[in-house]
Amino acid sequence: MPALGSQRRLLGSLNCTPPATLPLTLAPNRTGPQCLEVSIPNGLFLSLGLVSLVENVLVVAAIAKNRNLHSPMYYFVCCLAMSDLLVSVSNVLETAVMLLLEAGVLATQAAVVQQLDNVIDVLICSSMVSSLCFLGAIAVDRYISIFYALRYHSVVTLPRAWRIIAAIWVASILTSVLSITYYNHTVVLLCLVGFFIAMLALMAVLYVHMLARACRHARGIARLQKRQRPIHQGFGLKGAATLTILLGVFFLCWGPFFLHLSLIVLCPQHPTCGCIFKNFNLFLALIICNAIVDPLIYAFRSQELRKTLQEVLQCSW
């Protein structure tokens, strides 16, 4: 972990070395004095990780407690919370180890630190991939519930949902192991970036289509009730605002990290790209922020889940 100096080693193998197929090396010292580097203290990383940890533990506990929430939709939300939980645990673990090493409290061999770092890298990478997958699964689930409402319960069954969940976790673990093992190959970085773009496109297409369907439905209701046009416009604006927040948070939190991976392939020695490389810690912090925001968007908006959450908190006291 300390090998990168000022940069953390979360997914450090994807950050410190360019692909083997490229004869170039990252040159952060050539970025010049005009680079803007945002410093993220370890204490802030630890705080963000703990907040995310508490939030997502509460989501998992609430869904596990309430049998009314034992449905495919909430299982996908629960798995998203578990993915974000792994992001938080990885962050807290790495930050704690880094602080102990810097303070001289923890003394260990470099080989042990490297092995621990590899484990954390696999954990964080698998949690990132699974988080993106479950965000896509939630979008598909909502799409089916709107466009195939009468067939929803025959299409999205519990056994089928469990198979999808198991496949996502297995694929995420295998992907993370392969990514960390073959981090110095261009194709690995390109596959990760392509996966992010595919998930972003999938979510954008599905949610935009759902918004268009909802607006048409609102127009139909307005015509039946002989309502005026401003009511429909208000619904459309509310839906557009929700869609903007949902996709905007996803893009702002995940986009910079995958831009970083893209630039490692495209311009590892360019001074401007070097400036972006210096903010690797900021990009990781944004991903942790996404783990904080996800429960607010996908879980806490459910009245049933909020009610169960209150019961969980009351029991804990």
Swiss-Prot record:
Positions on the Extracellular side per record topology:
1-37, 94-118, 184-191, 267-279
Q: How does it sit in the membrane?
A: Multi-pass membrane protein
Location(s), subcellular: Cell membrane
Q: Which residues lie on this side of the membrane: Cytoplasmic?
A: 64-72, 141-163, 212-240, 301-317
What is the primary gene name for this protein? MC1R
Q: What is the role of this chain?
A: Receptor for MSH (alpha, beta and gamma) and ACTH. The activity of this receptor is mediated by G proteins which activate adenylate cyclase. Mediates melanogenesis, the production of eumelanin (black/brown) and phaeomelanin (red/yellow), via regulation of cAMP signaling in melanocytes.
Q: What is this protein called?
A: Melanocyte-stimulating hormone receptor
Q: Which residues are glycosylated?
A: N29
Pfam families, per database record? 7tm_1
> Which family is this protein grouped under?
Belongs to the G-protein coupled receptor 1 family.
Q: Which PANTHER family match?
A: G-PROTEIN COUPLED RECEPTOR
Transmembrane spans: 38-63, 73-93, 119-140, 164-183, 192-211, 241-266, 280-300
What is the first-listed, main subcellular location in coarse terms?
membrane
**What GO MF annotations does this protein's record show?**
melanocyte-stimulating hormone receptor activity
InterPro entries for this protein: GPCR_Rhodpsn, GPCR_Rhodpsn_7TM, Melcrt_ACTH_rcpt, MSH_rcpt
Q: Which GO terms describe its cellular component?
A: plasma membrane
Lipid tethering residues (S-palmitoyl cysteine): C315
Identify the keywords attached in UniProt to this record, alphabetized.
Cell membrane, G-protein coupled receptor, Glycoprotein, Lipoprotein, Membrane, Palmitate, Receptor, Transducer, Transmembrane, Transmembrane helix
How this chain assembles, per its entry, is: Interacts with MGRN1, but does not undergo MGRN1-mediated ubiquitination; this interaction competes with GNAS-binding and thus inhibits agonist-induced cAMP production. Interacts with OPN3; the interaction results in a decrease in MC1R-mediated cAMP signaling and ultimately a decrease in melanin production in melanocytes.
